[in-house]
């Protein structure tokens, strides 16, 4: 947000994270100062290294700077990039914004490593000063090299080593990120380096605003709020996420095999209460979706009942693990609670969960359940844990439920719930699933008022659609079929239905 204010978009903040307003993330179409799309963590060093290589190959001269948070450093992609950058020797500046937070509190061994680095600024200042002194005298560079070898041995025993130095980076810092003069000085020093350099900046999330300092997790990606109270404007207190978390706690209280896994999103996925009630069965792996999926597979193989809660947009990162570690074996009963499925609104294009139907449908043996309301979410979670032998994905949206609150999951012999048409023959059939059933029913009412005979088909289980619909719909299809869904066209339910009905010569 500070970057956007400094680059001419201050006046646009009245429409932050709104339709036709400015994005909460980097967006090149907004400004030439946004170098790339940004929304998912851990990728900045990779993109920056690519830009640095392009600069060198094309013979240009400019600095490339990647900014990455300590939370994003819990993602494996960041280490792939750091490893490659350090080995390449390509001049590149990486600014590590270390505020000990991602969205929730940071976790993992790296977080502890950074904590050690934070407490040794005296060593870093002394090291920098010694290089400046010896570098200014004749033969000083040889002295520095000699001292460095001794220094490394002493440091390895007495002081925490810097992982970044071991990976080939010049390590500068830590420096107080709220001291503008100190930050400017260390960045000028970094610009003089001719090799990969990491600047370690210590900041406090929400610095200078009491409410944000006291509750940093609540001020991640904020929309409008009252600055005098720190409270956001009204939102539904009961959401699919909260119902999921509540239901999982109830089930876990009765079954010690149930575990919860999340990738740095315990509060966002509704698992905060689970983490406090069942701390030994709660696993926050950091921003590491691939690891979360594969670890869940391992848990399931050894008799546990893992429920891995991940946003739809972030589960894309674990696609290979869903296939290789979960689905191929066929009998791994791991449950994936896919939050923020469909259009997410304020979070923008990078966070829309519109690809999950396409990529999940392509995985053999994976059951995909789509609750339309809270009651169905509860029923489907129970079914996934106790009535399925393989992997199950439960897909649900951001926010609360709509007007349709009936639990249509009582008869699992069929994945279809069909409304009774108001007329003997329906000329139009609307097919939908999940939260979009509310829009389908509204459309049916509007069309019926116009004298158009409509029936609505609600799909509870996407993975079984081909088997059930291809038979039933042949006998009761209207002349026109609409499929209403919030997903990309390629690989969507509508494409599946059109293909299956065409194969059966129904259309």
Predicted feature residues:
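Cofactor-binding active-site loop characterized by glycine-rich and histidine/acidic residues
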Residues: 1-88, 258, 262-263, 271-272
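Peripheral docking tails and interdomain loops at the edges
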Residues: 225-236, 345-347, 366-367, 488, ...
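A short, small-residue-rich loop immediately preceding and capping a beta-strand
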Residues: 36-37, 60-75, 92-95, 258-261, ...
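Active-site nucleophile and cofactor-binding loops and adjacent substrate-binding regions
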Residues: 17, 26-45, 68-72, 175-177, ...
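Glycine-/acidic-rich phosphate or pyrophosphate-binding loops and their flanking alpha/beta elements
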Residues: 185-188, 220-221, 239-254, 270-276, ...
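A glycine-rich helix N-cap at a beta->alpha junction
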Residues: 12-22, 86-104, 122-125, 283, ...
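Non-catalytic terminal/interface segments that mediate subunit docking, oligomerization
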Residues: 6, 203-316, 324-330, 411-412, ...
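Long, well-ordered, tryptophan-enriched scaffold segments
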Residues: 99-244
